[in-house]
Amino acid sequence: MTKKRKHQEDFQKVKLKVGKKKPKLENATDTTFKTKAIQIPEQLKEDGMLTTQNRKLNIKDLLSQMHHYSPGVKQNALLGLKDLLSQYPFLIDAHLSNIISEVAAVFTDKDSGVRGAAVHLLQFLASKIRAEQIAPFFPLVSAHLSSAMTHISEGIQEDSLKVLDILLEAYPALLTDRSSILLKNFVELISHQQLSKRLKSKEKLSWMLSVNPNRRVTSQQWRLNVLIRLKKFLQAVVDGSNETEDEGLQEQKDSPHSVRNPIFISWKVHANNQQHIHLYENGGLRPKMSSSFRLRSLASVMDSAEKGLSSAENLKGFIEIIIPLLIECWIEASPAQSAPILGNLLESDCQQLMQQVLSIIHLLWKLTKRHDETYKMEVWLRMNYLVDFKHHFMRNFPYSLQETVKHKKKDSCKGNKYCTTSSNNVDHLLLNLTLCDIMVSLASASTLQADSGWLDMIRNFVTDTLQDGSRLNSKQVNRLLGVTWRLMQIQQNKVATEPLIKAVYTLYQQRNLLFPVRTLLLKFFSRVYQKEDSKTQRIRSRSKVLSRWLAGLPQQLALLGLRNPELSNQLIDIIHSAASRSNKELLQSLQATAVQIYDPLGGTLVLLPAEAQRRLVQLVYFLPCLPTSLLACLSRCCIMGRMSSELAATLIGILRMRSSFAGWKCQVQDNAVNDVDYFSFLFSTLIGFSREELTSLQGIRGKPHISQTQLSPVRLYLTDLDQFLHHWAVTEVICHSLSTIPSQSQCFDILQTGICKYLVGLVVIPDSTAGSVLCAINKLLDQACILSENLHKFLASCCYSLLYFLLTLDKEDAEHVQKRDMLWGSCISALALLPRLLRLMLQSLQVSRICREELPVVAQLLRLLMQHGQLRSHMMTNEFLVQQIIKDIMTLKSGEVQEQWLTDLHYCFNIYLASHPQGPSPMNAVY
């Protein structure tokens, strides 16, 4: 076989017959295997939480679709992103950087649908993201907003205002920090630079209003939309300033950044070293910073261009640009020269534009007052803009709104000065008041003669508005009072100021004024009064209207009551300020209405909160005199519990200072309290109940209100714990006041006479009254005092009734258990000071008249009296009486099994009395 044939045999294909299987090779691999199906009912939960409701796209997919070329895909991505974030809010914090950057990037998208979806998403995010969270990304947001505001497309510019609204509402402080760029954008939205060959310097390029016919709205409406946002932006700048003011109603202080923090000092607490007084701002361990300066890091130091309106140079530059543009807007909207002069009627749209123009100027004027050299700034404003303002603004002053009037009657407009009313949220009165506020800020006392013409117009308008009687809102009244105050500062003679004060008082006398309006009027009058009172006596000229207003404040306070606590607090502050200055008219009025204010049933004192009560109590010190009727009211206020015991103590201390027993070394003022009335007040407050209340208690019988015993004619009325504790605290203060009276014997005689006249003979006496009487006796008793027989018997009956009540008291009665220490101490002290009192009480223990159930109580009382160290000697003196009482008890218990209490009584008698131990034992009674 040839070599060629052998070679072909190696590559010859084996032909298999049909139906025959191919034989397996020797080195073949078995590839057969078995499988089972795996069912996955749902995806992983983590991935499921990242999907939207329908499209199963997570947040990364949605953010990536924001770069798609199709507007529909981007719009759907924004809508899906809003749905996803509303369903899973925690994704906002995790992907905040990407979300903010992608949403801000579509502010300048060409498609309006995409921009609208972005605005809705931004509105949603603003309610979820805090200012400190978005602060690191806000420069990026501000840059995209600036690009949108200066975009060539009109639609993008219009939508940028919507974005601006959201950011102004949610993050005003962050937005105003970048005011230098945004203010220029506002200017470019309504104007363009006027290029002229005659202008050689580029720094003096002027601006003129632009007209774009391609916009969907008119040029005037577009300017109105932009100016509304500019006003909001400037308002945010003003609000973000450290210095705050109230439209000229706040007082000018030596330090504009000073803060008043009054400190309430309790001398009782201070005397015990429990309260430390810091007289100065940084007197504490931690200094309290009250500064207008804010510390910044070196990396954030800004140059003058980045300071925005906080720089006087930048503020002047912006005013020079915007004021001419605002004047052009005003000229377009102002009435035509050929229009009738009657009322200077304005269309609604024109009036809105004029209102925004004046509001922006007013805010700029406020910003000029925030700088150090305010006077120089005012001179600069007057020199540059007074002529234009007089020519354009004051020419048709005052302005009113033109409306379509249905002529149903021929004389329908006779009763109205301007024949117009406000509608469509247009406030023509606020327009006029804003103009007045701007103009009066350009005037001063030195320029009064030159400005007298237009100042008289403003003064007449303000006076007519105040006297018109129409209902004014708080914003109008605030601006109105600011103008009034400025007019009074420009011309300070009484001839000019008195009509203005009278006009304000006419408005103040109206009924049903809103609370903010009433508050503003009170602040105005208070400031006028303080300004007038600060003048020296030589140049002071009292305003009759102001005196009439001050005289009416106490009566208003008495009638107001609890209907408006905030207004009552303001009235109290003003009354207190005038009373401390010894204003004659106010003190006379306060004296006349004092009984109504301090009425214990429905007076202002008992109705208002604790802080207001404290201020009213302090007013008592300034009253010219304190008659009997007023002292009776004050006594009832102290004991009724409608004010705290600490405040009652303050009131008692004030009355002591106004009495002849104050201990002044020199005569500082006439004694406002009669001595008889003063003692009557102290005694009535000590008793704690009026005569009518004590009379009504005599008919009460039985438990749980009455504690009675057969051995004492006095029954105890059990008071509530709160009433008892309040009465006891007041009693301690009364006892202290009585102890400061120089003649103690005479004071004791007066107290003894009062007790014998009003208490002796009563069957039912409150437990707090009995304890208070014993406490006062213990405090005032000395060797020169002589007690009458009736008082001795009364006190002995009170002592036994109180001791019987304490010994029969159930330990589970938590309310009355707390009275034990105070009442027990009073009784023991009285028995120790008055040996005859102890003897009378022992003589009254006639056990033959009592029931067997009371015998253990008498035995326990005797045992405790014998064990008490202070009473040991007195009990030994009365040994025969004690022995007789024990013998009577043994007689009643003869023939019976001797009980433990009787054994204890025998033991104590044998130990303490029968054996006559040498010296008093230190053992005290424990029960």
UniProtKB/Swiss-Prot annotation:
Pfam families, sorted: Ipi1_N (PF12333)
Broad class of where this protein is predominantly found: nucleus
GO cellular component term, pick one: nucleolus
Family: Belongs to the IPI1/TEX10 family.
Function: Component of the PELP1 complex involved in the nucleolar steps of 28S rRNA maturation and the subsequent nucleoplasmic transit of the pre-60S ribosomal subunit.
Description of how the protein assembles with itself and partners: Component of some MLL1/MLL complex. Component of the PELP1 complex, composed of at least PELP1, TEX10 and WDR18. The complex interacts with pre-60S ribosome particles.
Name of the molecule in the record: Testis-expressed protein 10 homolog
The organism's taxonomic lineage, starting at the top: Eukaryota, Metazoa, Chordata, Craniata, Vertebrata
